[in-house]
Structure formats: C-alpha cells, structure tokens
Amino acid sequence: MQADILDGKQKRVNLNSKRLVNCNQVDVNQLVPIKYKWAWEHYLNGCANNWLPTEIPMGKDIELWKSDRLSEDERRVILLNLGFFSTAESLVGNNIVLAIFKHVTNPEARQYLLRQAFEEAVHTHTFLYICESLGLDEKEIFNAYNERAAIKAKDDFQMEITGKVLDPNFRTDSVEGLQEFVKNLVGYYIIMEGIFFYSGFVMILSFHRQNKMIGIGEQYQYILRDETIHLNFGIDLINGIKEENPEIWTPELQQEIVELIKRAVDLEIEYAQDCLPRGILGLRASMFIDYVQHIADRRLERIGLKPIYHTKNPFPWMSETIDLNKEKNFFETRVIEYQHAASLTW
C-alpha cells in the first residue's frame, strides 16, 4: 500500500502563494485554502439568489401589452430597453468566458466567474422569455444593436475595451498588459454592469413602481440583485489587483479610466434621450443626466478615484432598492452586506 502513495505533498497549496493574476506556479484546480474570502462570499451570495425567468408569471403583462393602456412612448421605452439588454448580457458573458477567466489565476475568484457566467445566461434567457410572452419580434429585439444607433454606440464602445484582451497573444505579465486587463474589468464591471445596466433598471422599475408590467419588473429586480453582486465582485477584483500590483496604478492609467467613464456617461445620456424623447411615468431624459453622473461618481470613488460630476440622485427610490451608499468595499471595510434573495423585500 505504501507504494501507492505518491510523494506529492509539496504540491499542496500555500495560502500566501495565491494571487489574483500572474500566479501560474499555484495549482488553480485546488480551491483550498481560500485566501480571498470576498470572492467566496460573492459566490455563496450568488448561489443564494438562484432563480429562472419562467418561474415568474407574465399574464398581467401580456394583458396590459395587448390593451390600449400603454402609450406609444411607454412602449418605446420597454422595446429599446429590451433591445439593449438582450445582447448586452451576452457581451458580458462572452467577456467573462473568453477574456477574464483565463487571466484570473485564483480558484475562488474563478469559482465566482463561473457562477456569474451562468447568471448572464439566465439574464439572456429572461429577455427571450419576455419577448416570447409579449409576442414581440424577437429578431428585431436581439438585433437592436445593429439597428439602433444609441445601442450600437454603447456596444461598440464595449468591444473597443475588450479587443486587446481577446487577442490570443495577450498577456498580463507586464505592467502594460495588466493595465489593459484592468481597463477591461472597468469597462465591463464598472461601466457596463455598474452604469449602463443601472440606468436601464431605473426605466423598467419605474413601470413596476406604478403597478405596470409587474412580471417584467419582478424579473428586473432579480437581475438587479445579481448585478449588484457582479458589480461588487468586479470592484473587489480591481482593487485586489491594484493592491497586489501597485506599480500599475499610475496617474496615466487613472486618467485613462476617468476618460473611459466620461465617454460611457455621454453614451448613456444619448441612449436615455433616444428612449425618452418625451417624458413618461415621471421620467425625463434630463433626469438621466444627473443619475448617470451620480452613479459614475459612486463607481469612481469605490476604485479609489475622485468624483467628477457632483450631481444629486434624482431617483432616491433606487437607493432604497439597492442602497448605493451602503455598498461596502471589501478593501475599505472587510465587510460585505448582502441578503439572500428569499429574504429580500421590495
């Protein structure tokens, strides 16, 4: 029996040897010992929020959609919102699988990335389920990023950010390479999921607040819960990489990130103006200027940068839904406050 035992104890993982990136000497297949407890907490919280769109009845939404009780402007907001989200979730999922996962060398962080990729698939399924339920032209909705200029501009911007990281020869073992990787993380976690998506949530949840399209609203609430964890994981990942590789956090990189976020804010304002040429449900396109700038400042602060807009939140009810002021940055507080989906009240 003794001959069956291999002399491999030296390959057991040392916790202090683990790093988020550029750590190929540590066996990424060994989950334990867990070093980055924040990554594992995000994974557990994601699993606690498990849901599927088909669990949510759409009968009242179908009845309302087929009636004359929605204005053309209200229908426009819903259709353009679905047009953006239907492919945006796929872009995020593809970026996780094809760009981020291979360059993250920590198993607990990878564990969460796998969970997140599944959730992006569920979200894409959600938009198909909504289209099927309402009898919408699915091809038109899912092709909106080729037919609507404001949606295409946002998605093209995202693809610019991920282009270099998708190159098969891309590496993160240089300062420049790791800086490019961090910009990718900013583009998808901070901008796409933390700015573009939150603006879209306001539009649809405004219907839900007035007891309209309540099935869609409930699904967006579940997506918002998921995306809040995605955002927090992304921020912790960015800050963790900064902490382990302080040489990358140069004034030049910081300014590049600020400029990316400024561009994103401008693009989101243009999209809001396309969605809302006239006011509905107490929403006006001008309100989204303040809101997008407000949440952009909050995202900048959470990765250690100064706010640039200093605008107030015109939608305080969104802060009541997911209180941005109480989101805890792991690297500032070492505390993560989440509630399981089953215990959340709306």
Swiss-Prot record:
GO molecular function: metal ion binding; ribonucleoside-diphosphate reductase activity, thioredoxin disulfide as acceptor
Listed cofactors: Fe cation
Top EC category: oxidoreductase
GO BP terms: deoxyribonucleotide biosynthetic process
Alphabetical keyword list: Deoxyribonucleotide synthesis, Iron, Metal-binding, Oxidoreductase
Cofactor mode of binding and number, as noted: Binds 2 iron ions per subunit.
EC number: 1.17.4.1
Subunit structure: Tetramer of two alpha and two beta subunits.
Designated gene of the protein: nrdB
Binding site for Fe cation 2: 120, 193, 227, 230
Source organism of the structure: Chlamydia trachomatis serovar D (strain ATCC VR-885 / DSM 19411 / UW-3/Cx)
Catalyzed chemical reaction(s): a 2'-deoxyribonucleoside 5'-diphosphate + [thioredoxin]-disulfide + H2O = a ribonucleoside 5'-diphosphate + [thioredoxin]-dithiol
Family: Belongs to the ribonucleoside diphosphate reductase small chain family.
Residues annotated as the enzyme's active site: 129
UniProt keyword Iron present: yes
Listed name of the protein: Ribonucleoside-diphosphate reductase subunit beta
Residues reported in the UniProt entry to bind Fe cation 1: 89, 120, 123
Function as written in the Swiss-Prot or TrEMBL entry: Provides the precursors necessary for DNA synthesis. Catalyzes the biosynthesis of deoxyribonucleotides from the corresponding ribonucleotides.
UniProt cross-references to InterPro entries, sorted A to Z: Ferritin-like_SF (IPR009078), RNR-like (IPR012348), RNR_small (IPR033909), RNR_small_fam (IPR000358)
Classification via Pfam families: Ribonuc_red_sm (PF00268)
